[in-house]
Amino acid sequence: FPAFARLFSRCDIVMARPKIYPYNLYTDYCKCHIESDLLTARQVIAEKYPAYLPDFDRVFFRNNRLSHFNMFVLPRERFEAYSAWLFDILFEVERRIEIQDDPVQGRVMGYLSERLLSVWVRHNRLKICYKTVLMVNDQKRKGLGKHLFHTTVNTLAYWITYPLRRRSPRRAAE
């Protein structure tokens, strides 16, 4: 896929554009989920991957941005490294916690993995390209055509004017 090759020449991972919260990710998790599950994940990381603990604390206590949906693109080698790290942690967390019989809290492993991706990316100092995720459902389907039209027009305008921007005197002087 040539598009991915070009993309990965500029970054190491592609992630969903982050949501910005008015508080840190620890507070967000505790408001929406079970705090002890997160603290168990932190304990597992402290035991199995202690070098990641400062990054865990930074992501959860000094950060208010989160890329949701567990959607990302990585080169295969990095994906395999991330998966080995993540599932080693999640399987141990699963052994230690009581998974709730609740449609929301029962998805605890998904919620943890969304957040642990940021820990892994930070620890490995990956350069991120953020992309917008387009959600399509019955209510939004009517607006999709308009959105795609504007996206297409903006993309075409960008690429049509690209040669002009490359030759502009301002860019030549830079």
Question: Where are the model-predicted features located?
Answer:
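ER/Golgi luminal nucleotide-sugar-dependent glycosyltransferases, focusing on the catalytic module
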Residues: 1-174
